[in-house]
């Protein structure tokens, strides 16, 4: 058969509704908005083609390989209820299209080119099914939830954190002082802000030294293990690893990375270093909203969360459901489960398009932070459960009496909520009452309750199904 040149419809090759998906396929659910006049099958097939083996015309070299073995296939298309001209296109990719252990390569293939495609008005990657055959090629989180609890000797409750503010402008010594006050008051962790790297007003090495001093002082006073997320994010991978090495030499328990701005390659390198050297790794998701906020275009955060679990991190920010930053309850809980659990059933009501089996990849602790304070504690304890980190930045440092009393207020509120829950009380219904009772015994908590009694951040949720 001679080579037949020319342009042919994608759907002739890449739309295969009778395809049976394999256990080793990577499956993707795309929300496709075709341009007017483009049939959904053609749009779905175009996505499958452009994100796998296809190009815009048939090429002579197609004859030198087996397209059937390597092509992505659009195997199902369904209209999105309540939206006109939006479809969910399901695409199956053969495992051999991807380099083992590389989130970078996976994303370059699946979302690399296709989002600029002219036949589509908009495109969003809603979910990915990562087969065990692929996830087993990743180290995953450096330590995971259980090992972290064992290292810190903290069980049966969420962990408490605080981002040091003002995020930019403090000198290293004053920064360390703020860290010490928070940890002394009863927090488990304090945190570098995501944009604190190594700036003229505070170089990274000075900050690391003063924070380590604060850590050890607070540890000696409280008898509890303390941590400060030292942000190792830097302009080059080598510099990032250098900072992580220095943190390890100081003997601190945890470092931090901005995984989207730093990039998956850097993040995976750091995760490997952290496992090899006994450091926990806290992950911040700066830049995520650029990618995930639009309903019809981009990548949903649940995909970025799955990618992080593969690349590696022990904590990741995941919205609060109640604070100042976005997060719809069911959907947020959907990807919180994807981060923590071994096996997650498909559940479209929570935005989970595929059953995901992580086999034994360690879990990641979700971090709730952003505009939360003591009155939110019952809701947060109920929504996130024990395996989470609750971070109060302004909710600690904004306390009228200072950082340490702010930390005391949060710790008392948390312990009261955990105790009430363990006694079988309903946090959703009696939450305010529980906090009020506890504040009778803690003047610090009473003062915090007074300051924030009226604060609410209420807007319509953007992320609905």
From Swiss-Prot:
Annotated positions for site Transition state stabilizer: 324
CDD domains in alphabetical order: RuBisCO_large_I
Binding site for substrate: 113, 163, 167, 285, 317, 369
Enzyme type, top EC level: lyase
GO CC terms: chloroplast
Enzyme Commission numbers on file: 4.1.1.39
Catalytic residues (UniProt): 165 (proton acceptor), 284 (proton acceptor)
Keyword Oxidoreductase: yes
Subunit: Heterohexadecamer of 8 large chains and 8 small chains; disulfide-linked. The disulfide link is formed within the large subunit homodimers.
Function text: RuBisCO catalyzes two reactions: the carboxylation of D-ribulose 1,5-bisphosphate, the primary event in carbon dioxide fixation, as well as the oxidative fragmentation of the pentose substrate in the photorespiration process. Both reactions occur simultaneously and in competition at the same active site.
UniProt name for this protein: Ribulose bisphosphate carboxylase large chain
Species, as recorded: Idesia polycarpa (Iigiri tree)
Phylogenetic placement of the source organism: Eukaryota, Viridiplantae, Streptophyta, Embryophyta, Tracheophyta
